[in-house]
């Protein structure tokens, strides 16, 4: 996990504390809010998501290719989440992306909020929250892939553009590979992806979860399902991701060498895949970047 200048990050963080305090005060007279069995930071069972070696998809042995595709489909059905290794994205590139994220989120809050950087995609907290339990303690940039190569989006962050272009290209290859397997498992033509997927349906999101003084009470992201087709996530060693399997919340053991894959709502409509609610719960300050395929 990359270390950072704590003072610098405090100056650059959005006013999450003020907004959360306002919600606490404005709802103090209300009954406790029930947001569907919220998880907590208390000790819970740690799980290892299904770990799939994608080199099996490229094997010269047909049985190994079939077995790998079956693993992907079965993990999608049973968990809605799985991890992949040998995905083709070098650790060095992931580390460079993480370092650039730290630089980006270290920019003063007012500049992030008003400069229009990364297609004016900066957002923080939860503007629609009416209760503290609905509030996400995080900030993010949510960039359409159609904008990733536009120099005007980056301002002074010239090197960030180079890294993001590499990450977007690499993530696209992994996403298409996995989406192809899942589409075929649904009995559809693999070529269907070419008809329904292009850069306009894909996003790269950079997330930052600042240190939270209410870490026992608030999530980095509130429990949710992803309303897309497929999400591919890389997080650092800080951990914090939790998923619901059945009626139980499980802490996902971080694996910096792996990518986490989440089957989104749009795919679950067409499969018996379980609904996998997941929040981000604080264990430490950390960064992540998901890649979204949205159809």
Language model features: what each stretch is:
Residues 1-295:
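Peripheral, non-catalytic segments flanking oxidoreductase cores
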């Amino acid at each position: 996990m990359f270390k950072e200048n704590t003072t610098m990050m405090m100056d650059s963080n959005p006013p999450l504390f003020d907004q959360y305090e306002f919600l606490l005060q404005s709802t103090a007279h209300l009954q406790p809010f029930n947001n569907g069995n919220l998880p907590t930071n208390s000790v819970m069972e740690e799980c290892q998501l299904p770990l799939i070696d994608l080199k099996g998809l490229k094997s010269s042995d047909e049985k190994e290719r079939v077995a790998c595709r079956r693993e992907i489909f079965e993990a999608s059905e049973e968990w809605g989440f799985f991890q992949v290794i040998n995905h083709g994205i070098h650790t060095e590139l992931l580390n460079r992306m993480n370092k650039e994220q730290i630089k980006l989120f270290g920019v003063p809050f007012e500049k992030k909020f008003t400069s229009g950087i990364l297609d004016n995609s900066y957002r923080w907290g939860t503007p629609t929250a009416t209760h503290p339990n609905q509030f996400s303690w995080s900030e993010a940039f949510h960039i359409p892939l159609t904008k990733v190569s536009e120099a005007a989006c980056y301002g002074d962050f010239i090197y960030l553009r180079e890294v993001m272009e590499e990450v977007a290209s690499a993530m696209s290859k992994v996403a298409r590979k996995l989406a192809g397997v899942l589409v075929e498992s649904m009995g559809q033509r693999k070529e269907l992806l070419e008809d329904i997927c292009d850069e306009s349906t894909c996003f790269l999101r950079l997330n930052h979860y600042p240190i939270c003084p209410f870490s026992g009470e608030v999530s980095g992201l509130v429990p949710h399902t992803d309303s897309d087709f497929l999400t591919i996530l890389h997080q650092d060693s800080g951990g914090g991701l939790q998923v619901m399997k059945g009626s139980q919340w499980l802490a996902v053991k971080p694996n910096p060498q792996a990518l986490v894959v989440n089957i989104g709502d749009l795919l679950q409509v067409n499969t018996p895949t379980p609904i996998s609610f997941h929040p981000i719960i604080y264990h430490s300050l950390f960064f992540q970047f998901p890649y979204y395929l949205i159809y």
